């Protein structure tokens, strides 16, 4: 029996990978500027972008908070796995470029589980080119136990791939398939794919070809131009979705969600961050981990969000990721669901 099996974002969680805050850093190169900090692409502003190692104290606090998350999930009967130890900050080189490594905080960004298949995504940042090495032993174990394991074609990520000065949402050119796994949400037979600065059109086309006729990949255009979809849409259970009111409108809401009940996320607490420039906005607080229908992990500082969820019959497990804005990972991002109960269904109501 395969140890891998996920069909959506909400079925009861049985096994999960939780990332680590050991030695993450931000590598200064063209891809980081285009994908994460394009507003600093002008003359003389590159130096304002935070690069290099993160503060030790923040990493220690984050690692402690991740361990608390692990313990809570274990207490709920969930099997918890962690990345293998490695020097994630070691330089990454190809014939075209060189970058510092990135880190292994967010397994969600690089690996996508669809059914019994684990897919290595062709990630947009050069620094993350070899990030899947942190999970290699786990992937081999899952393969030996009956899962499928495929990898998208390794992208070249040459200079021409990026357009830092281009319009938001068009800074990742369509020269080869490139996308982060966190650009994708699973709704049974339907997958939402965010076309943005961390996922291009060719990426959606490759994903559809890899998954075949059993699935429909829906490219979401004009929804959110920056990175990842989990701070914009959060499916909570069949027919109920949390939406970001600053981004989602009647016009750009994906068609498969139009018959679902929508909950607008309230304004989130203005969490602090170390340094002068945050990695992400306060909407990182929408990055929730659904443990099962009716229970989600949410940052305890977002009290109004917790109240809204509870009014809609969703219980909360309040925990904390103090440095989410600095490190760029909420509870959805720092986890990768490996197995959930349930079967493949279609959720078009």
UniProtKB/Swiss-Prot annotation:
InterPro entries xrefs: AmidinoTrfase
Pathway: Antibiotic biosynthesis; streptomycin biosynthesis
Organism: Streptomyces griseus
Cited Gene3D superfamilies: L-arginine/glycine Amidinotransferase, Chain A (3.75.10.10)
Name by which UniProt lists this protein: Putative inosamine-phosphate amidinotransferase 2
Enzyme class: transferase
Record's function text: It is not obvious if strB2 participates in streptomycin biosynthesis as an inosamine-phosphate amidinotransferase. Attempt to measure its activity have failed and the nucleophilic cysteine which is the key residue for amidine transfer is not conserved but replaced by a glycine residue.
Keyword Transferase: yes
Substrates-to-products reaction catalysed: 1-amino-1-deoxy-scyllo-inositol 4-phosphate + L-arginine = 1-guanidino-1-deoxy-scyllo-inositol 4-phosphate + L-ornithine
Transferase listed as a keyword: yes
Keywords associated with the record: Antibiotic biosynthesis, Streptomycin biosynthesis, Transferase
Enzyme nomenclature, EC number: 2.1.4.2
Example of a GO biological process term: streptomycin biosynthetic process
Site, as annotated: Corresponds to active site cysteine in strB1: 333
SUPFAM superfamilies in alphabetical order: Pentein
A GO molecular function held by the record: scyllo-inosamine-4-phosphate amidinotransferase activity
Family named by the database record: Belongs to the amidinotransferase family.
